[in-house]
């Protein structure tokens, strides 16, 4: 439909790539919820189809836009906070902390892909990148503390550290 210039992909992760490929082939720009792929291969395929079609895409990192975050970014860019050497990010959410909770697509690896890392920690990583710049190195560990759900990445705690090549 030529009246449609852009689409919003807000489905379960397992169909993000399929929808993106169809939209790109039709010349439609897109906003896609994160993660755009369930694994690095799907993520690279998403980027490739968007680039090949010459359409614009935006990934749904909505925590970039509050005024406080914008102000912090401006202060950092202006050097008003000094030489930053450490970033500590937290993303606290309660929807997945009940072992008896409803089993949704987010807890099924074939549908969700990266589990907690893709669903929640990607916001923390994006915020570090958005505020400070490209990340050069990452060190991390994780532990699943709710193991009674079907094979997924349920109830995972993840810690990671990033290093910046420019500092």
Feature annotation, model-predicted:
Residues 5-7, 114-115:
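Short active-site oxyanion
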């Amino acid at each position: 439909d030529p009246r449609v210039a852009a689409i919003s992909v807000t489905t379960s992760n397992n169909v993000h790539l399929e929808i993106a490929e169809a939209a790109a082939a039709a010349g439609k720009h897109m906003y896609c919820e994160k993660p755009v792929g369930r694994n690095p291969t799907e993520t690279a395929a998403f980027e490739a189809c968007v680039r090949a079609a010459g359409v614009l895409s935006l990934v749904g990192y909505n925590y970039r836009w509050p005024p406080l975050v914008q102000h912090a970014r401006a202060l950092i860019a202006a050097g008003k906070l000094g030489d930053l050497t450490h970033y500590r990010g937290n993303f606290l959410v309660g929807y997945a902390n009940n072992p008896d909770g409803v089993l949704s697509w987010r807890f099924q690896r074939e549908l969700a892909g990266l589990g907690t890392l893709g669903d929640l920690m990607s916001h923390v990583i994006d915020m570090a990148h958005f505020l400070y710049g490209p990340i050069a190195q990452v060190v991390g560990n994780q532990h699943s503390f709710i193991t009674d759900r079907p094979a997924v990445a349920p109830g995972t705690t993840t810690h990671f550290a990033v290093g910046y090549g420019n500092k």
